[in-house]
Curated annotation (Swiss-Prot):
NCBIfam families: lspA
Matching PANTHER family: LIPOPROTEIN SIGNAL PEPTIDASE (PTHR33695:SF1)
Entry annotated with the keyword Protease: yes
Name of this chain's protein: Lipoprotein signal peptidase
Organism: Methylocella silvestris (strain DSM 15510 / CIP 108128 / LMG 27833 / NCIMB 13906 / BL2)
UniProt keyword terms in alphabetical order: Aspartyl protease, Cell inner membrane, Cell membrane, Hydrolase, Membrane, Protease, Transmembrane, Transmembrane helix
InterPro entries (alphabetical): Peptidase_A8
Taxonomy of the source species: Bacteria, Pseudomonadati, Pseudomonadota, Alphaproteobacteria, Hyphomicrobiales
This enzyme's EC code(s): 3.4.23.36
Reaction catalysis annotation: Release of signal peptides from bacterial membrane prolipoproteins. Hydrolyzes -Xaa-Yaa-Zaa-|-(S,diacylglyceryl)Cys-, in which Xaa is hydrophobic (preferably Leu), and Yaa (Ala or Ser) and Zaa (Gly or Ala) have small, neutral side chains
GO terms under biological process: proteolysis
Gene: lspA
Function: This protein specifically catalyzes the removal of signal peptides from prolipoproteins.
Length: 171
């Protein structure tokens, strides 16, 4: 399977899993009326409406702000799609697929509902992490894979900093 096809498949599966999870929790399970649900001593399922991005940064309270944030998300997604199209590395294709699928999942929420639905809340004692969704987890995993590739991929002499998987010579 080519990196392009692999990345597109990962993006589609990520988007589908994210949207299915959100729709099931909201409309089938009814999380809004049943929260919080303790999955583990450190993990709850809750329902949070996030008008911004991670940590509610760039909170979009007006229609203009929401559409500006949506436009920024779509521009970044287009950049990632172009990067995926040029990728020759399956690792990078998977990473970009995770980021693209997650970004599209959250962009859909923002366009359709005016906010992103978040559900998962990690906490230990008084420490509390932000509430996130599968799309956010996919984006973080994709960025982690890109970081892994940039730190640990074999580098060839004269590659201009490119990993072998991205068109660099193995010599």
């Amino acid at each position: 399977m080519s990196p392009r096809v692999l990345g597109a498949l990962v993006a589609a599966l990520t988007l589908a899993a994210d949207q299915a999870n959100k729709l099931w929790l909201i409309f089938v399970y009814g999380i809004e009326q049943r929260q919080p649900i303790a999955l583990a001593p450190f993990l709850d399922v809750v329902y949070a409406k996030n008008p911004g991005i991670s940590y509610s940064l760039l909170s979009a309270r007006t229609d203009f702000q929401r559409y500006a944030l949506l436009g920024l998300t779509l521009a970044a997604t287009i950049f990632m799609i172009l990067w995926l199209w040029r990728s020759t590395s399956k690792l990078i294709a998977c990473a970009l697929g995770l980021i693209i699928g997650g970004a599209l999942g959250n962009a859909y929420d923002r366009a359709a509902y005016g906010f992103v639905a978040d559900f998962y809340h990690f906490h230990v004692g008084s420490f509390s992490w932000y509430v996130f969704n599968l799309a956010d987890a996919a984006i973080v995993a994709g960025v982690a894979l890109l970081l892994y590739d940039s730190l640990f991929s074999a580098r060839g002499a004269g590659t201009g900093g490119k990993s072998r998987g991205e068109g660099a010579s193995a010599l």
